[in-house]
A protein has these predicted regions:
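Generic detection of well-ordered alpha-helical segments
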Residues: 33, 37, 41, 45, ...
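Amphipathic alpha-helical segments used for helix-helix packing
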Residues: 76-95, 144-150
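Short, structured helix-loop boundary elements
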Residues: 11, 33, 37, 62, ...
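Hydrophobic alpha-helical connector segments
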Residues: 38, 52-78, 131-135
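C-terminal peripheral helix-coil segments that are non-catalytic and often amphipathic
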Residues: 74, 108, 112-120, 137, ...
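Short coil/turn segments at alpha/beta junctions that flank glycine-rich nucleotide-binding fingerprints
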Residues: 3-7, 58, 79, 120
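Amphipathic alpha-helical packing segments from all-alpha helical-bundle domains
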Residues: 45-52, 78, 94-120, 129-134, ...
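Helix-turn-helix
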Residues: 2-34, 38
């Protein structure tokens, strides 16, 4: 799916790649859509678990966001194909259903973390989509540069602790209320 996208996925192609009969796939999945949804839910839950490892919604905003960045970066750098797959899902008709069925504590913990940070005066109040875009898009772009092995200028790029710390510090500064 990562290589050919959803349109390029057929049960026959998948069966051939797995060296099994297409009928075998239908024992486990009702349809192509069911296969995509089940794999997507599994992958989403793995990413949620990786992000939440050692995370507590009671952490300070600074500590909690840094922790999430490091967990997410570690997961995506270890699993670049999964990251690409999840990006495909995020912009597909399957995403809403995946989130609904994943039914994870992830969203609740993220919402609690943001609410706590706002209550403590550590984070400006923003619509969740604006917060999420500012808080995590820079990390995802850095990970993509790393996976591609090149930065925006075409020169070699490798994501390291220093780059993560620089970027997350700027993000935190931008999301804190003026004092």
């Amino acid at each position: 799916m990562v290589k050919d996208g959803f349109d390029g996925l057929s049960m026959h192609k998948l069966a051939k790649a797995a060296t099994i009969s297409p009928a075998t796939i239908y024992i486990y999945f009702k349809s192509r859509e069911d296969l995509i949804l089940q794999i997507s839910i599994t992958e989403e839950l793995k990413m949620f678990d990786a992000t939440l490892e050692g995370f507590d919604p009671e952490m300070s905003f600074d500590e909690g966001l840094r922790h999430q960045w490091k967990n997410r970066a570690r997961y995506f750098l270890k699993n670049p194909k999964r990251m690409h797959f999840m990006e495909q899902i995020r912009y597909s008709r399957f995403h809403g259903e995946v989130l609904k069925r994943a039914n994870s504590e992830f969203v609740d913990k993220m919402m609690q973390f943001v609410h706590n940070a706002i209550e403590r005066g550590e984070l400006i109040k923003l619509p969740m989509e604006v917060y999420w875009s500012v808080a995590f898009a820079p990390l995802y772009q850095l990970v993509k540069f790393h996976i591609n092995g090149k930065g925006i200028n075409g020169k070699a790029f490798q994501l390291d602790e220093t780059a993560i710390d620089q970027a997350v510090s700027i993000v935190i500064k931008g999301l804190k209320p003026d004092k």
